[in-house]
Every structure is written in C-alpha cells, then in structure tokens.
Amino acid sequence: MKNAFSLLNPRIRELIRKEGYLHPTPPQEKAIPVILKGGNVLLIAPTGWGKTEAVFFPLFHLLLDDPRGEGIKAIYVTPLRALNRDLFRRMQSLASSLGIRMAMRHGDTSGYERRKQLLFPPDILITTPETLQAILPAPKMREHLRRVRFVVVDEIHEIASSKRGTQLSLALERLVNLTGREFQRVGLSATVGSHEVIANFLGGVGRNVTI
C-alpha cells in the first residue's frame, strides 16, 4: 500500500529506509503531499511525531529537483540556537548524502564560517529571527537570498506571541521583495492556542495556509 514516502525521490526513500523510517507518522502522511505540491502549511503535532522529518523529507525532494545554481534556497528559522544545533546534527548526514549543503547562522557563528557561507552558500540555512533580520541588508548575502524558495518557522507559537514575531513578519516581507516572488511557507508547533491566528501570522496578508 502506497503512503506519503512513496511520493519522495527514490534516493531519499532509500536513505530514510536505511535510517529506520519505514512508515510515515500521521502528521507526515498529511503534510508531505501538501508540501510537495507547493502549499503553505501549519503543522501542529505533539513532540515525537516527526514534524521535523515531515518538512525536511519533502524539502530534500524539492531541492533535488531544483535546476537553479548556487544560492540559499531554503531558510529554516527557530527561536533558539540550541534548536538550530540539534536540527543540524539530526539532518546534516541525510542532506550531505544527497549532495545538499546545510549551514547554521546565528550570533555564535565564527567569522570563518560566515566567510565560507559567502563563498559557498548553503542550500539550506538554519537561523534565528534576529540573524535573518541582520543578514538581509548585507549586499553579498542578499544575492544568495534572492534564490529562496522555502521558509520554515519552527516553534512558531513561541515566535508569533512575542516581539520577535513582528521582527520575523517584517523580515519575511522584505524577503518577498528581495526574491521578487512568493516562496513556500511552513510552520511547525507542538501546541497552538488559535490555529487561525498562527496561520495568518505565517502566511501574512492574502496567502492561504493549510492547517
């Protein structure tokens, strides 16, 4: 019987099978097809139900199909540097096996790593709201950010309910202006008070979000 994993690139299916991902969880079964079709998604599910994989697996698929060259194609925003590091640790091996470059960028990032990102921009940049706001005006980073096609916001309830939410909303609109087109948006949360409010925060004005 086919499931959401059957929609993924065969290389991804083989890799995740070796990692022990044999069957999608219910959130993955629902989210993966929508993400693959280009829809904006707010994914709400308890911790331990594979929300991260529900985003990264289809993201890897879409990046493998991306014909464009160098540049940052996906931005993954989290509220915490520790979460950045955890995500990188969990997904870097899979990404590397697929030839997809990942990198982190936040206040602790070394000067060497920042220069490396300018010379060899990652396909996926994991960052924080503050750092995204900080790199948007930088001329060389702007060139790399013009290729962004996807933005993921993890722990979106924490960001939306604070001053950082306004900061991130402004950064995303600036990113739309920079890219000259809409990009796909995905929000992740284990708990959300009002689904509609968070979906509106994620999508902004006039953009549909599937919950």
Locations of the language-model features?
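Interdomain "pre-motor" coupling segment immediately N-terminal to P-loop NTPase/helicase cores
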Residues: 1-3
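Conserved P-loop/Walker A NTP-binding site and adjacent catalytic elements of P-loop NTPases
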Residues: 6-7, 13-211
